[in-house]
């Protein structure tokens, strides 16, 4: 599959009920899907559409701006066809769990651990979901928009910075 347009069309045909939005931004296709289908969508794109590389996994916190607080973002690349595709999935704060992409892309392992560590989003069936950047005893998730700027229970630094 050499053309992202055709990959998006195939995705729409196979996962019509799962797709929430399809749009283009600055030449890149962005497809938003229900979080319940993220693993199946990623597997389909890898196997059927040759998006063989997961370039990045991250999250966005839309505190107070969207019905679902978080948006998971997966950046895929087709190396043979030099194509990119972004897949997004909304995640509610009340049910802050999504399927793990490690079942499809092994490279998702540390990327998902980073999202868990910094945003608190859990990944179902992740092989080793634990903190990767913050210490194990760290309280909270520092990239959440409601996280205290000075950190939990920490005094502002009063020394010299230079």
From Swiss-Prot:
Record EC number: 7.1.1.-
Leading EC class: translocase
Signal peptide region: none
Main location: membrane
Lipid bilayer topology: Peripheral membrane protein
UniProt KW Membrane keyword: yes
PROSITE patterns for the chain: COMPLEX1_30K
Gene Ontology MF, one: NADH:ubiquinone reductase (non-electrogenic) activity
Catalytic reaction equation(s): a quinone + NADH + 5 H(+)(in) = a quinol + NAD(+) + 4 H(+)(out)
Keyword Transport (UniProt): yes
Keywords in alphabetical order: Cell inner membrane, Cell membrane, Membrane, NAD, Quinone, Translocase, Transport, Ubiquinone
A GO cellular-component term linked to this record: plasma membrane
Cell compartment(s), UniProt: Cell inner membrane
Bilayer-spanning residue ranges: none
Annotated family: Belongs to the complex I 30 kDa subunit family.
Function: NDH-1 shuttles electrons from NADH, via FMN and iron-sulfur (Fe-S) centers, to quinones in the respiratory chain. The immediate electron acceptor for the enzyme in this species is believed to be ubiquinone. Couples the redox reaction to proton translocation (for every two electrons transferred, four hydrogen ions are translocated across the cytoplasmic membrane), and thus conserves the redox energy in a proton gradient.
Assembly, per entry: NDH-1 is composed of 14 different subunits. Subunits NuoB, C, D, E, F, and G constitute the peripheral sector of the complex.
Protein name listed in UniProt: NADH-quinone oxidoreductase subunit C
Source species of the chain: Trichlorobacter lovleyi (strain ATCC BAA-1151 / DSM 17278 / SZ)
């Amino acid at each position: 599959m050499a053309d992202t347009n055709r990959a998006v069309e195939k995705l729409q045909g196979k996962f019509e009920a799962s797709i929430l939005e399809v749009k283009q931004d600055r030449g890149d296709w962005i497809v938003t899907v229900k979080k319940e289908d993220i693993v199946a969508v990623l597997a389909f794109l890898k196997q059927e559409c040759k998006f063989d590389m997961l370039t990045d996994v991250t999250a966005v916190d839309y505190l107070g701006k969207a019905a679902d607080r978080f948006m998971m973002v997966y950046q895929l690349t087709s190396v043979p066809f030099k194509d990119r595709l972004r897949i997004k999935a909304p995640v509610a704060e009340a049910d802050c769990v999504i399927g793990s992409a490690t079942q499809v892309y092994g490279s998702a392992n540390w990327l998902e651990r980073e999202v868990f560590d910094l945003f608190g989003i859990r990944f179902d069936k992740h092989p080793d979901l634990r903190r990767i950047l913050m210490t194990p005893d760290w309280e909270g998730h520092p990239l959440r928009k409601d996280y205290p700027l000075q950190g939990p229970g920490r005094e502002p630094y009063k020394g010299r910075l230079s």
